[in-house]
């Protein structure tokens, strides 16, 4: 939910009282037309708040927490669960980790340390995150709390996106820290959410060979289903064009 323009202007006055709109846009990298349009509409995007916060060395989480819609972000950060951390490891990183385990190394090949994990978010980070915290009823609770239709919520997950409002609502519905979904959706970084340095790597290292291999297998199966649907859709499209001559 975008923040009200009036509340945004009060907040901006508090962190940059002497800065002009041109100054703010220049240091934050936001186009002046973009900010002007948001102010005219009376709704300022959360991404705008985050970009300006970073430019003025203000915590994006603390900045968002000053707005009523995101008051749940206030207070000391809550650590992510083990499942949340693992969900933010990309499938390629999981595969590299599997191959780097001693159990997978052949007699001819020495075990090599895998490269550092790629930064969150990744190609399926949003759906993986929701699946990691879902007890089977989270989607229903989010729909009841926000009014979003279940099919619309599922569509966002399939597209690997989640609005900040729904990300926080999902966290609350699952009983986890309120910033995990914002990391999964790419609005804020792990560090900005208060995640300890190296937390994802530590979570990965704690997985047994069996658990790691099973997780990588599940990810590959999910990827296979997506690719098959894409291939089927492409084949149908080509058939339609052929029938049209």
Give names to the regions the model predicted.
Residues 41-48, 71-75, 158-166, 190-191:
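Short, solvent-exposed alpha-helical "recognition" segments
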Residues 20-25, 52, 138-145, 170:
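Short alpha-helical "recognition helix" segments of helix-turn-helix
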Residues 1-21, 65-66, 80-139:
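A short, Lys/Arg-rich alpha-helix, primarily the initiator
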Residues 20, 31-33, 45, 59, ...:
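Short coil turns linking two alpha-helices in DNA-binding domains
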Residues 46-63, 165-181:
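DNA major-groove recognition helix of helix-turn-helix/homeodomain DNA-binding modules
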Residues 29-44, 145-162:
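Recognition helix of helix-turn-helix/homeodomain-like DNA-binding domains
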Residues 28-29, 56, 146, 174:
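Core residues of bacterial helix-turn-helix
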Residues 65-104, 184-231, 240:
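Short, charged recognition helix plus adjacent turn
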């Amino acid at each position: 939910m975008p923040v009200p323009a009036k509340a945004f202007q009060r907040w901006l006055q508090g962190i940059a009282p002497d800065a002009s709109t041109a100054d703010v846009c220049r240091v934050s990298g936001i186009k002046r037309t973009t900010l002007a349009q948001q102010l005219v509409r009376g709704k300022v995007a959360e991404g705008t708040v985050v970009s300006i916060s970073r430019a003025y060395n203000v915590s994006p989480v603390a900045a968002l927490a000053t707005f009523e819609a995101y008051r749940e972000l206030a207070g000391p950060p809550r650590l992510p669960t083990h499942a949340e951390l693992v969900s933010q490891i990309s499938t390629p990183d999981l595969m590299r980790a599997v191959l780097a385990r001693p159990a997978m190394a052949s007699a001819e090949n020495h075990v090599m340390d895998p490269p550092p994990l790629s930064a969150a978010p990744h190609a399926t980070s949003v759906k993986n995150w929701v699946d990691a915290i879902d007890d089977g009823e989270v989607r229903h609770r989010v729909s009841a709390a926000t009014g979003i239709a279940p099919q619309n919520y599922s569509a966002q997950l399939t597209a690997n996106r989640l609005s900040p409002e729904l990300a926080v609502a999902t966290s609350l519905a699952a009983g986890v820290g309120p910033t995990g979904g914002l990391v999964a959706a790419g609005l804020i970084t792990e560090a900005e959410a208060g995640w300890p340095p190296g937390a994802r790597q530590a979570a990965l290292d704690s997985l047994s060979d069996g658990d790691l291999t099973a997780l990588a297998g599940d990810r590959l199966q999910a990827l296979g289903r997506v690719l098959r649907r894409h291939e089927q859709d492409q084949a149908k499209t080509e058939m339609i064009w052929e029938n049209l001559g």
